[in-house]
């Protein structure tokens, strides 16, 4: 529910707020997140808890989209892809620390404590946004009709297809990562936490490495990260039965997962020069479409009785489709795209 809400509401929320300056909009979006988590922490029933997640979903895509736009705007032309990747690195570090800690905390304390912890962190974030976000003019010449042309750009549509049809394979496996580790590895709660930490650590390193890839080499490097994802996913169930190999493959899975996202984010944002504001939010939204589809595909496969090892094989097949679409993208770029002089 959260992922599809982000995908559907995110672009609409960004269109509504196009004229709001980034240094004002970002604290407002974080405030929405704080309120949603207060509602979640105090929720008397599941319906109210679900409502809190929907509230939180309204700010997800615009928040990361605006952050990436600000980073790309203040960076020099030669450093734009690196700036976008650094924003993604913040998210990756949050995953590295937050997911295992949340899992650990949830195993020993009331789930409402987790919401309270997120509220405290969000308040600190909001204060930081108010203090440090520069007053850059992202929205001075914002034009809704011009921004909507992003949906007519063939290059962007191809990249969107790569994310939707390729990256959903990643989420098909990622959805069941924790239960697979519990069922097939020798680890218990602490070991599971370490595995999730290794996934996040791999994500941070992968993000930082691919964040330095210049614009004209993004497409070629996508083949490498997709290949790494394919291999780690199809071997995941077999490899995690050994403690050392389990930690290694969790690291590689994180490396491939978060090493791919800055490449795709940069491709969408840098390809949408006619619609920079909506494109950055669209990138965050499309990843959540892939998240939603991957979870649905995985759930359907599990419900019909397929074992985890077959689900990971199907995930690998979906990633191969993403690699094929990347080939289509490469052929399109050879004919129609001229990369800037700084690449």
State where each predicted segment sits.
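Helix-loop-helix hairpin linking two adjacent transmembrane segments in secondary transporters
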Residues: 48, 77-78, 82-131, 176, ...
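C-terminal transmembrane helical hairpin of 12-TM major facilitator-type secondary transporters
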Residues: 220-264
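Paired small-residue
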Residues: 36-39, 47-56, 244-252
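Cytoplasmic helix-loop-helix junction between adjacent transmembrane helices
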Residues: 52-90
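Intracellular juxtamembrane helix-capping segments at the cytosolic ends
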Residues: 63-75, 259-272
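Helix-to-loop junctions at the C-terminal end of transmembrane segments
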Residues: 9-21, 206-218, 302-303
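A late C-terminal transmembrane helix in Major Facilitator Superfamily
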Residues: 270-306, 315
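Conserved MFS/SLC helix-loop-helix module at the cytosolic interface between two early adjacent transmembrane helices
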Residues: 8-44
């Amino acid at each position: 529910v959260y992922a599809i809400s982000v995908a559907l509401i995110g672009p609409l929320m960004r269109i509504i707020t196009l004229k709001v300056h980034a240094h004002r909009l970002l604290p407002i979006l974080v405030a929405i997140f704080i309120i949603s988590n207060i509602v979640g922490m105090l929720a008397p029933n599941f319906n109210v808890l679900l409502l809190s997640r929907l509230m939180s979903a309204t700010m997800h895509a615009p928040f990361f989209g605006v952050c990436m736009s600000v980073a790309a705007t203040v960076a020099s032309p030669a450093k734009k892809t690196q700036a976008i990747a650094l924003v993604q690195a913040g998210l990756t570090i949050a995953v590295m620390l937050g997911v295992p800690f949340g899992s650990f905390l949830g195993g020993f304390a009331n789930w409402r404590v987790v919401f309270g912890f997120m509220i405290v962190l969000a308040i600190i974030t909001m204060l930081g946004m108010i203090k440090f976000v520069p007053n850059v003019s992202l929205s001075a010449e914002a034009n809704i009709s011009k921004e909507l042309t992003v949906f007519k750009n063939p290059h962007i549509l191809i990249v969107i297809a790569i994310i939707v049809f390729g990256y959903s394979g990643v989420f098909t496996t990622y959805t069941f990562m924790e239960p697979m580790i519990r069922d097939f590895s020798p680890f218990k709660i602490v070991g599971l936490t370490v595995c999730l930490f290794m996934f996040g650590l791999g994500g941070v390193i992968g993000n930082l490495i691919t964040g330095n890839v210049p614009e004209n080499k993004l497409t070629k490097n996508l083949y490498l990260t997709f290949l790494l994802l394919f291999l780690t996913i199809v071997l995941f169930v077999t490899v995690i039965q050994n403690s050392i190999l389990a930690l290694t493959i969790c690291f590689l899975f994180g490396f491939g997962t978060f090493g791919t996202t800055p490449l795709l984010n940069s491709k969408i944002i840098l390809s949408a020069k006619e619609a920079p504001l909506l494109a950055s939010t669209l990138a965050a939204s499309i990843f959540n479409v892939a998240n939603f589809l991957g979870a649905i595909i995985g759930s359907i496969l599990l419900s019909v009785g397929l074992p985890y090892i077959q689900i990971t094989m199907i995930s690998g097949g979906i990633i191969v489709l993403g690699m094929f679409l990347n080939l289509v993208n490469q052929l399109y770029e050879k004919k129609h795209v001229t990369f800037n002089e700084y690449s």
